[in-house]
Regions:
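Juxta-kinase regulatory segment immediately upstream of eukaryotic protein kinase catalytic domains
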Residues: 1-36
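An alpha-helical support segment within catalytic cores of ATP-dependent transferases
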Residues: 13-25, 133-196, 206-207
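A conserved alpha-helical element in kinase catalytic cores
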Residues: 18, 44, 55-99, 107-128
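Protein kinase glycine-rich loop
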Residues: 37-42
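ATP phosphate-binding glycine-rich loop
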Residues: 45-51
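Active-site beta-strand-loop-beta-strand hairpin of nuclease catalytic cores
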Residues: 52-59, 206-208
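Hydrophobic residue at the +6 position relative to the catalytic HRD Asp in the kinase catalytic loop
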Residues: 201-203
Length: 208
């Protein structure tokens, strides 16, 4: 979260976070469910706060910094419908807020032996790969071909700016993949919705 202090937009969002949280708690009739002295969970793009709904059932309130992926995450979760991903209970486009099924933040796929984790991960990849349907929100998802072309432009400069942290051959191999996927993706007629950040720490267990 500290990275948002580096620019004006990020600082403005951090300053507004308390108000955004208070507004969602009121609008969705939620109570904080934090253990005394503990902090909300924070990640690369936002915070997640454990809450209780009006009927006492547990949930998680996620508020993300407004960026392209955060703006369409609610559409992906709605499409998955709680199968292979946490269920979306409610969302607010203006604040990039979502009320989610609460998973067990203390149990991730990173805790599972690698051979077993690979089987679970592969099953999730297949389960979450969905073909488009006529709903208009599909047009809001970024195409991996465009992302690959973007990386082709950005990776060399980033690699140089970061002090060339790995060998040039590895950079060139990554660029080759990006350039190939960009070209192939533009010609493909078989689009699928995929999870683009499915590392083991992002695969959490359901309670119980």
């Amino acid at each position: 979260m500290a990275r948002y202090r580096r620019n004006g937009a990020g600082r403005a969002w951090l300053d507004s976070l308390h108000g955004l949280l208070a507004d969602r708690l009121e609008q969705w009739q939620l109570d904080l469910d934090l253990v005394p002295g503990s902090m909300p969970w924070s990640g690369h793009g936002g915070i997640v706060v454990p809450v209780r709904q009006e009927d006492g059932s547990p949930a998680a309130l996620k508020i993300a910094f407004p960026h392209d992926e955060a703006k369409v995450e609610r559409h992906a979760l709605a499409r998955w419908g709680g199968h292979g991903a946490g269920a979306l209970l409610s969302s607010d486009e203006a604040s990039c807020a979502m009320l989610l099924e609460r998973l067990d933040a203390g149990r991730s796929l990173a805790d599972v032996p690698l051979d077993d984790a690979a089987v679970v991960w592969g099953g999730l990849v297949r389960q979450l790969a969905l073909a488009p349907d006529p709903r208009p929100e599909w047009r809001e998802f970024a195409h991996i071909a465009a992302r690959a072309e973007q990386w082709s432009d950005e990776l060399p400069a980033d690699w140089d700016q970061l002090g060339r942290p790995f060998p040039r051959w590895l950079l060139e191999a990554a660029l080759e993949v990006c350039q190939t996927r960009g070209a192939v993706g533009r010609r493909s007629a078989h689009d699928l919705l995929v999870h683009t950040d499915l590392h083991f720490l992002n695969v959490l267990a359901r309670p119980g």
